[in-house]
């Protein structure tokens, strides 16, 4: 069923979400990465990107924060572009682990594959697959170019975050070499880990992430730049991955309460994809116990529920002037 709203009405809903959530004091910044612990906890922004390229944004949507695990979506798309859907399914997989995002146990339980590129093990594996094999500099260029194409503008590496991540990524070092033990990493493990750490340290804005989400929702065509970033056949594949594991072991609850596939990161960002309709992103540093932004979750849930939209319903938003 079509749900018609004016652009002004949609802006009002986004503003309402911001106003309703802004004063929430729940959660706390990630404290196991020193840089993230020191980000201003009061920062908060919401951005929506429509498929015609129009954006609606409220709050701190131009602040660059650490993309963290939201970058897993971007590199999964790059791997899908370079290898195709079947090879990624065979070499990495698309299943949720039901365990925390940085789980080593998940590798031990399912050592024939890494489950999904949207948890740490699968993301490190995906970084190892990025072409050209064996060339760290060119791999990095491909990763950054892909993020730029999806977001419509370039990210910026946050050097302090990269150092902070590199100094504390002991668990991920174990993951990389355990993957090597099971032949589930496809380039040098240390190189793959460094690429993964760097991509998580890219600085992006909520506005940029909403455009990236809009690109997925638009079947691979960036709504703002109009560039075809990836083939339309891959959009349902990456959206399925996000829907299955975007909030890790809490994805079921998220889908039940929000109705939108979304990926979260410990930098405070959440990026949601409503296929054929829009992309949405929100950012606020304080996280819940599972590492998901408290305010960003509430804001996106408010917008979805207020508009009566759900990826599993036949409601379709039409924005009119």
PLM features: what roles do these ranges have?
Residues 62-64:
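A short acidic/small-residue loop/turn micro-motif
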Residues 137, 166-169, 177-237, 288-293:
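Penicillin-binding protein/beta-lactamase superfamily catalytic region
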Residues 36-39, 114-116, 167, 259-263:
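Short Gly/Pro-enriched turn/cap motifs at secondary-structure boundaries
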Residues 2-20, 24-26, 79-199:
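Active-site-adjacent helix/loop patches that line small-molecule binding or acyl-intermediate pockets
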Residues 1-10, 19, 23, 30-40, ...:
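Non-catalytic interaction/Regulatory regions outside core domains
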Residues 219-321:
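Structured C-terminal helix/loop/strand segments within mature extracytoplasmic catalytic/sensor domains
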Residues 22-58, 271-272:
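A short, well-structured edge-of-sheet supersecondary motif
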Residues 52-53, 66-89, 212, 280:
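Active-site SXXK
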């Amino acid at each position: 069923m079509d749900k018609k709203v004016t652009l002004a009405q949609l802006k009002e809903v986004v503003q309402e979400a911001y106003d309703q959530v802004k004063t929430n004091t729940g959660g706390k910044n990630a404290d196991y990465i020193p840089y993230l612990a020191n980000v201003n906890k009061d920062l908060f922004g919401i951005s929506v990107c429509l498929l015609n390229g129009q954006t609606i944004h409220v709050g701190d949507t131009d602040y660059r924060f650490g993309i963290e695990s939201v970058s897993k979506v971007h590199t999964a798309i790059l791997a899908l572009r370079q290898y195709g859907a079947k090879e990624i399914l065979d070499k990495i997989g698309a299943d949720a682990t039901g365990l925390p995002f940085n789980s080593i146990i998940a590798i031990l339980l399912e050592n024939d594959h890494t489950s999904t590129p949207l948890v740490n093990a699968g993301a490190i594996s995906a970084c190892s697959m990025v072409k050209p094999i064996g060339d760290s500099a060119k791999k990095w260029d491909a990763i950054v170019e892909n993020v730029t194409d999806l977001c419509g503008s370039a990210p910026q590496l946050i050097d302090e975050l990269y150092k902070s991540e590199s100094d504390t990524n002991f668990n991920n070092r174990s993951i990389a070499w355990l993957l090597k033990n099971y032949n589930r990493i496809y380039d040098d493990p240390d190189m793959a880990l460094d690429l993964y750490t760097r991509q998580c340290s890219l600085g992006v804005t909520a506005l940029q992430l909403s455009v990236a989400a809009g690109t997925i929702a638009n079947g691979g065509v960036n709504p703002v730049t109009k560039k075809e970033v990836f083939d339309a056949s891959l959009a349902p594949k990456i959206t399925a991955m996000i829907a299955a594991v975007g909030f890790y072991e809490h994805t079921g609850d998220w889908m039940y309460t929000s109705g939108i596939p979304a990926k979260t990161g410990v930098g405070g960002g959440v990026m949601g994809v409503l296929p054929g309709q829009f992309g949405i992103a929100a950012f606020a540093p304080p996280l819940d116990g599972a590492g998901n932004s408290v305010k960003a979750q509430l804001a996106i849930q408010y917008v979805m529920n207020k508009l009566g939209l759900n990826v599993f319903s036949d409601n379709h938003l039409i924005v009119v002037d």
